[in-house]
Amino acid sequence: RLRAPEPLPTDGPVKVVELPILGGSMEAQAQALMPASGIAPTLTPDAVAALLAQVPTLAQLYVDILGGAADRFAEIARTIARPPDAARPASLVHCTAGKDRTGLAVALVLSAIGTERSAIVADYALTEANLAGAFSESMMAMFASLGLPDAPQLRELATQSPPSAIEAALDWIAAEHGDAAAYLRSGGLTDDELADLRTRMRDAG
């Protein structure tokens, strides 16, 4: 979105609600690993190894995101529960890839309305196959442009969706808040909004 014109008309039927969630952008993650100069060719093998040692696992990334974005995730749930235009109640949640920040948002909403954990994990795990091909390779090309190798930890971070990652996120939510509903409440979602979310999601079909 920062590199290309907005494709949607501002006066059209789609209302865009921007909710920045820091820490989830793969490009931002990659840039954060680079030295201040950002000059990829200067990276020595030891420097590359040191950078790769800083790469978080998806589980670590998800816990970090959750720890600082309860208000944003609550706003996503609120927007779904009470859409800005009642005549057009459908919602599309998306980030750059639709994997990490989106995966957490969808997992939170599904968990908060009572979806079985196994179904949430299975839904998240499907993302990897959906991203395979051009998108995944473009992400690895971006890493290569920064002088970083095609390392397993980078490929997982940018292109994969192992069940263990979302399992770790759900475990953290349970340990820190009890459940997803309580996590969303900690971000400002009210009980009435939570009830509306459950009604809208369960009656959507």
Question: Model regions: which residues?
Answer:
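Ser/Thr-glycine-rich phosphate-binding loops at phosphate-binding pockets of nucleotides
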Residues: 97, 101-102
